[in-house]
Design a protein with these regions (language model features):
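Primarily recognizes the serine-hydrolase "nucleophile elbow" in alpha/beta-hydrolase
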Residues: 185-249
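The feature captures the conserved acid-bearing segment of alpha/beta-hydrolase catalytic domains
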Residues: 237-291
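Histidine-bearing beta->alpha loop at or near hydrolase active sites
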Residues: 297-309, 314-318
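Surface beta-strand/loop "capping" patches
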Residues: 312, 321-364, 389-397
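Short beta-strand elements
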Residues: 425-442
Length: 442
């Protein structure tokens, strides 16, 4: 299988003065100076502590060295960006893991669920996958900005960056650019703290952070893959035309930050989504995945929302790390074969490279299919309130199958997908196919 983005991309929703942006004669492209970003100069690094701790993995303890530090990444939107960071490194780091790093930020809220980031995205992958992992606190958007403007939400801060973009045509003032710089500087800070270079790196980001890591992959050959949650590219030229009618600067933004599926067609990438994410329309996600030809996988968590909070999503990410960093073969979950019976539907899973599959489930929900109106739309979307149910598939004659009773059901509202639990060594996680809409065969 080869596959919304911008939780608050009001720019593309066309909420503010498209006429003004249409008059701009000069557009400034995104500037990425890797030499400067990789230099420790200006980090103002503050080393806080180094300690050893253990994580239990399959009834055994894995020792990690935990570095705590603080660094300065940039001045952005009239504010100094300082970041608290945690680097977890296996004490017994295998030779095959040297030079590798999993870098995570802008995935879940540091303030609301700090444990999910440090434990689920930090300690656990370091211990289970066996690679160094860096997590750090994202942009401090609610300090000086709130004092200056009286606005307290990150959405309002992001909207302010888009206002600057409209007035200047400069891609470097958009929130995504600031997030990208912060991640690159975090990487350099981790190298300074650890004393060694990381030249094979996987990035993870959610929502606007998901867009940022996908864009970073286009500028830095050391980035071998990304995990994107709460965010997918725009699936169709039709959507881009519609958004450009609302906001004439859309093509410039799309070009600079590589937002089209075609920009990712041959990349190594994983999408880690929630079935009910307001920003990841299930049908759009399917259309994106159908356009990808590289090494790509998706996991859709049933009843999951915008942030990738579920333990199963963390486990899916660890599977991907094991696959990309160490080359372990990874099953490829395809859309199931569906056969209509009398008052029932039969489902047969289709899984390429099935080694390691431990269990398979059918996920289904009934809701009205409504076309996605575009990023940052405030329209009510039926999929956001869908109630997904899971049904185990039984393995018979080498095939995983299940039957869904449908008497009295409105099959025009049926959506479904297959997910599989996979084990690779000491890493267990989930993968899925994209959400499908049932279409009755003629």
């Amino acid at each position: 299988m080869k596959p919304i983005v911008l939780t608050s991309l009001v720019l593309l929703a066309g909420a503010l003065q498209p006429a003004q942006s249409a008059k701009l004669e000069k557009l400034t492209p995104l500037r990425v100076d890797l030499n400067a970003l990789q230099s420790p100069e200006g980090l103002q690094l503050e080393r806080k502590s180094v300690r050893e701790e253990t994580v239990e993995v399959d009834s055994r303890e894995v020792a990690l060295r935990h570095y705590v530090f603080r660094f300065f990444s940039q001045r952005f939107m009239d504010e100094d960006w300082w970041h608290d960071a945690h680097l977890f490194v296996p004490v017994e780091l295998a030779d095959s893991a040297r030079g590798k790093l999993f870098l995570v930020s802008h995935v879940v809220s540091w303030r609301k669920v700090p444990g999910v980031l440090r434990e689920g995205y930090g300690r656990q992958p370091a211990a289970r996958v066996g690679v160094p992992v860096l997590v750090f606190k994202p942009n401090p958007v609610q300090r000086e900005f709130a004092k200056r403007t009286g606005l307290n939400s990150e959405r309002e801060w992001q909207d302010a960056t888009f206002d600057r973009f409209r007035k200047t045509g400069d891609a470097n003032v958009v929130s995504f650019a600031g997030i990208m710089t912060a991640k690159w500087r975090a990487w350099t800070a981790a190298e300074a703290v650890f004393g060694k270079k990381f030249d094979k790196v996987i990035l993870a980001g959610g929502s606007k952070g998901g867009l940022a890591v996908r864009a970073m992959m286009k500028f830095d050959p050391r980035i071998i893959s990304v995990v994107s949650s709460g965010s997918i590219p725009f699936a169709s030229p039709t959507m881009l035309r519609k958004l450009t009618e609302r906001e004439p600067l859309t093509p410039h933004l799309v070009e600079q930050f590589k937002i089209k599926p075609a920009d990712l067609a041959n990349d190594t990438i994983m999408f880690n989504l929630g079935s009910n994410d307001h920003n990841a329309h299930p049908t759009e996600a399917r259309l994106v995945m159908e356009q990808l030809r590289g090494d790509a996988r998706i996991y859709v968590h049933p009843n999951g929302g915008h942030p990738a909070l579920a333990p199963q999503q963390g486990a899916a990410m660890r599977l991907w790390l094991r696959h990309v960093f160490f080359g372990d073969p990874l099953p490829d979950v395809r859309p199931p074969v569906v056969e209509a019976g009398e008052n029932s539907l039969g489902f047969r899973a289709v899984i390429k490279q099935p080694k390691g599959v431990e269990a398979v489930e059918l996920c289904h929900a009934f809701y009205r299919e409504k076309p996605w109106p575009g990023p940052a739309s405030r329209e009510r979307m039926p999929h956001k309130n869908a109630e997904w149910k899971t049904t185990p598939l039984a393995k018979r004659n080498g095939h995983y199958t299940a039957t869904l009773e449908t008497k009295g059901a409105d099959l025009g509202r049926l959506h479904y997908y297959i997910r599989a639990r996979v084990r690779l060594g000491q890493v267990t996680g989930w993968l899925s196919c994209p959400v499908q809409q049932y279409v009755k065969k003629p």
